[in-house]
Amino acid sequence: TAAMALSFGATSASADCGEVSITEMDWASSAVVTAVANFLMTQGYGCDVQVVPSSTVPALTSLAETGKPDLLTEVWANSTPSYEPLRAEGKLVELTNVLSDGGVEAWWIPAYLAESNPELTTWDGIMANPSAVGGKFHDCPSGWACDIINNNNLKAAGAEAGGLERFQHGSGETLQTSIAAAYADQAPWFGYY
């Protein structure tokens, strides 16, 4: 789930807002959410906003250890095991889902591929014919929480031995571009998003 979370010690919104630290995670949608939050807080509440470049794991670690930053503008809560304990301990409060449906992280194939090859909707089907998905798993960039999770799951499932290469993208943008290019060409694609 993509959520906006407020740390326990965060300054409340008021006419005398003061200093507030907010994250800008290292993916495109977070940059938009951060820009909107920054604008509203500075223009609407007179806050002195400090934007902190980060990503999920470092931001949550900092929050757990220091109570900062005050606002995590976009967190994919299902990709990090520390989110729920921090929420349960009262160290963060979830304000809202940033994306209308909350966001879904998963392993995907394009609908056109599933329709023409329904067997590819299962792991066993993919491993029976990895070339049908292009012979590779498009993975998230290093530093994202999904990097470790996906790598461990692929190793445990024997992906490489079964003929499926893990291709780790250098950024969220190149991962998105690979999806868009596959759709434009109706080409095989399998990976995380």
Task: Please give the residue ranges for each predicted region.
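Gram-negative bacterial Sec-dependent N-terminal signal peptides
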Residues: 1-14
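Solvent-exposed loop/turn segments at secondary-structure junctions
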Residues: 27-30, 58, 77-81, 113-115, ...
